[in-house]
């Protein structure tokens, strides 16, 4: 009788283990992922806010300095001083001095960082901006909120929906 209990227990344990490895059914390729109306509303609101921010930043940047260029992904940049070092690309280890401020000039952060490009260790706008630089460059990036800390911010230092100015120097 004891042997039967052991066999049944072992059998149930094996069935339990095997059922855990079963793949979940996939969504058919002809059906899209359903989103509710609240999600769509929030998406539309954020897209409209991003468009308004882009228009506002364009106005601010062009009033400030017409030598700024707009990147493909939406931030503004200006290389102040061109270095003679290697171009920065993914997997490059670089050391930068970085001053972060709001559009009205309030300095939020001023420090030296060492980072590996492509590892998402800094906000998207800064990482993509650094890829436009060479070692030895000094640059200014004006990064919209959606390429910085987004709608959540980085409280208490950076409020939600805050566009930022990064003044950077890339060391050799």
Segments from the language model and where they lie:
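Bacterial N-terminal signal peptides
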Residues: 9-17
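Cross-family detector of peptidyl-prolyl cis-trans isomerase
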Residues: 2-8, 20-172
């Amino acid at each position: 009788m004891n042997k039967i209990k052991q066999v049944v227990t072992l059998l149930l344990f094996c069935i339990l283990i095997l059922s855990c490895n079963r793949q979940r059914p996939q969504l058919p390729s002809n059906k899209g992922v359903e989103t509710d109306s609240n999600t769509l509303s929030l998406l539309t609101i954020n897209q409209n806010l991003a468009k308004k921010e882009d228009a506002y930043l364009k106005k601010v940047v062009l009033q400030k300095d017409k030598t700024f260029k707009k990147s493909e992904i939406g931030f503004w940049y200006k290389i102040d001083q061109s270095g003679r070092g290697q171009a920065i690309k993914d997997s490059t280890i670089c050391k930068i001095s970085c001053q972060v401020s709001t559009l009205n000039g309030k300095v939020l952060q001023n420090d030296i960082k060492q980072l590996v490009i492509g590892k998402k260790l800094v906000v998207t706008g800064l990482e993509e901006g650094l890829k436009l630089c060479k070692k030895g460059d000094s640059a200014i990036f004006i990064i919209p909120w959606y390429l910085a800390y987004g709608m959540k911010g980085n409280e208490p230092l950076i409020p939600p929906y805050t566009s930022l100015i990064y003044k950077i120097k890339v060391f050799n």
